[in-house]
Amino acid sequence: MNVPYRQIRAAYTDTTITVYQAYDPAIAEPAVAARRFVPPFKRERMTWIKPSFLWMMYRCGWATKPGQTRVLAVDITRAGFAWALEHSCLSHPEPGTDAAEWRQRLRASPVRVQWDPERTPRHHALPYRSIQVGLSGAAVTRYLDEWITGITDVTGMVHDVHRALRAGRDVTDLLPRKRPYPLPTELARTVGATPDAPRPAEEGV
């Protein structure tokens, strides 16, 4: 499969996109009950949302790492996701970017975007990247109060897939379905997506 180097792949509907986060039960359980994030979740901190289920599994170790033992599938509006991307800045400047302009945008933007190697179920790095979106300030407020349409605890499914993986099974059919996420040209340019381009020669895996 020829996957573009930087492409958003996600589960989505006509109106929502699913992103993943992992937390301690003290945060996850009240969030699931309230269908929104409530204290002890801290609005003041940057929070990272991840459309890639397998990258989330890499980050949380299949829900085994301290503070990340509950995995939540968070459905947010596609309009909200578009707002986040539109108001984002890459965590690192692109080659050829004016450094001063990038620093100015970084300071002004409430959203950070970074592209990390996508992972296999066994955490091996793949030769293409998945997006991580960091929300702070006004973006966190919008995320918490406007964008979220549902929160589902998928930890049980995570454990089931992990058990199958450890038993040596092919878990492909057990994973959440994902497909390329459509991005308008301007948004793709803002976040550095490469929907039709090969892997840039100057970047490593």
Task: Briefly describe each language-model feature range.
Residues V38-W115:
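ADP-ribosyltransferase catalytic core
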Residues M1-R43:
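ADP-ribose/NAD+-binding catalytic cleft of ART/PARP-like enzymes
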Residues R6-V19, H92-E94, A125-L126, Q132-V133, ...:
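Partner-binding and oligomerization surfaces adjacent to conserved cores of proteins
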Residues I131-V205:
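Glycine-rich, aromatic-bearing surface loops/beta-hairpins
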Residues A28-A31, M57-R59, A84-L85, H123, ...:
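Short helix/loop capping segments that flank catalytic or ligand/cofactor-binding pockets
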Residues P25, W55, A79-F81, T120, ...:
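Short, solvent-exposed loop/turn segments at secondary-structure junctions
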Residues D24, I76-R78, W115-P117, L135-G137:
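Short, structured patches in soluble enzyme cores that scaffold and shape functional sites
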Residues T69, V111, R119-R122, V133:
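Catalytic-core elements of nucleic-acid end-processing and repair enzymes
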